[in-house]
Amino acid sequence: RWWSARPTKTEYLGKTPLVVGPDLHMEIKLKAENPKSVGADRIVDCTYGYRKCKGSCIIVDFGTATTFDYVNNEGEFQYTVIAPGLGISATALTSQTAKLPEIEIKKPESVLGTNTITGMQSGVVYGYIGTVEYILKEMKKALNDYDCTVIATGGLGRVIASETDEIDEYDPDVAYKGIRILYELNKGVK
């Protein structure tokens, strides 16, 4: 990259920041094809999920993209699914059509829209619930791990998590908790 926040932050804080990446001491093992390609957000999410569950888990992070990251009972992160996020889906619907307006992403009162706005909200939200449920069921089947815990996080996760039994819990602070764990594991490591 042509830029870095590290020198500025180091000078400002008088401390060297903890840069999340595959070289940190971690409780999880990055078994992805290319560990350096695993984003910091996904590392901290999986760190927290594995620590909390003490076993296999899928962390669903509803961000710009929605990521479904699997950590097995041995703490190995190897498998992932990445889908367009709810916001991207809604934006595409608006930007790629002639007359559909921008919408607030929220669950409408009914799956049956009574106007363009509620019809779009229904399609985006309920369509996304279906996508999430299908991906989670297929992941569990492919992994032969039907008992893994599914934790949802991310700003729009609350919209989906409450609507499906495939998600065991929603926690908006997964990333912060994962960062804290990594900090504790690495604070004395040089």
Regions found by a protein language model. Name each.
Residues 66-71:
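Short beta-strand scaffold segments in enzyme catalytic cores
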